[in-house]
Amino acid sequence: RMDPRLFNVSTTAAPTKEELGFHYLWRFYKTLPKNGHITIYDRSWYGRVMVEKIEHLTPDYRTNQAYEEINGFEKSLIHDGLFVIKYLIIINEEEQLKRFKQREEDPMKVYKITDEDWRNREKFSAYDDRMNEMVNRTSTEYAPWILLSGQDKKAARIKVLEHFIQH
């Protein structure tokens, strides 16, 4: 059994003014789980090599350096006794469009879709390229990516839960 009081979900938005004054990984140290607890990241330090690369927010040499920093960060977490499990749920462009339209049409979900989502959708190919590079450069023996098809949202969620429970 898992006690929900031991779970925390950490969402990652754009860095604050304070966070910008530090190394980009600094803000994640504050969200690491306590001993016996679990933190689930909705986005994470991978924004450095995805969003920041695509939006040209970080110079290319720093983005490339980030891959080594991320691998080192995850290795240090594991050496400190944390488990790092990385899931990447992948959908194709058609499925994304279908979900966007459903959100716009459903009054209970319309808040989930923004102009920024549509703007980013125009960069689907760039995100796909960055995603492939990210997986290739950060799937390590100690912290491999678990890649799952997200075409069927419910099935993907079940697969994540099944895998998580086994580990």
Feature-to-residue mapping (PLM):
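A conserved segment at the C-terminal end of the G1
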Residues: R1-D3
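Conserved nucleotide-sensing/catalytic segment adjacent to the nucleotide-binding pocket
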Residues: F7-Y67
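Conserved nucleotide-binding/hydrolysis micro-motifs of P-loop NTPases
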Residues: P15-E18, S44-G47, I90-L97, D117, ...
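Short loop/turn elements that form and flank the Walker-type P-loop nucleotide-binding site
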Residues: P33-N35, D80-L82, E141-Y142
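A glycine- and Lys/Arg-enriched "phosphate-lid" helix/loop adjacent to the NTP-binding pocket
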Residues: V51-E69, L77-D129
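NTP-dependent small-molecule kinase module
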Residues: D129-H167
